[in-house]
Amino acid sequence: HAFCLEQREDLKWPASMYLEGSDQHRGWFHSSLLESSGTRGKAPYESVLTHGFVVDGRGRKMSKSLGNVISPDDILKKYGVDILRLWVVASDYYDDLKLDNAILQSQAESYRRIRNTFRFLIGNLNDFTKEEAIDESEFPELEKYLLHRLWEVDQVVQKCVSTFNFHLMFTTLLNFCSSDLSAFYFDIRKDTIYCDSKESVQRRSTRTLLNIIFNHLVRWF
């Protein structure tokens, strides 16, 4: 902190957060706190966030002797960078982060569900304009219920972001996409979208809500 934060005008001291592995409780976190408190009378950070270490699917340390090391390059070649990112955000970093091919395959399935949710939304919002939108007060009961569920999810997401609980945030969003949307709302309103007239209140309400959901999901993800 003395050679970085205090020497650069574009950075502030104390740091808003120190982020490191659990081994740094007696290392960097501790030594920085002692030095800064002794020379400046104040901690060099406002908060500390600790994460676990990457281990294999059985919770063992990765090593060449065990033959359980998974190279990031191999993951990128087989699954792509988005699956690796998804694994990171879906992992509960308060504990060690388990990683193997079965876990990555599970995240690939989660990615497929999220992608299909966006595909449905984009495909059924073609040519949607603000003139077609209908006031939320005129929504049918089903749309009002989904609007309430959207609000509930947003409350969880905001709290998770402020507390860095990305694991719960991702689980909440995945369940919302899979259960509330794909398995429930989308399935019910398919006939409305495909069969009702463009001027019908129910179809306009459905498309208005789909637009609201889409904009929320884009911000959340």
Name every feature range the model reports, one short phrase each.
Residues 133-143, 153-158:
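Short His/Asp/Glu-rich catalytic/ion-coordination signatures at enzyme active sites or charged loops
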Residues 198-199:
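Acidic, serine/threonine/proline-rich low-complexity intrinsically disordered regions
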Residues 1-127, 146-189, 193-194, 209-219:
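Structured secondary-structure scaffolds
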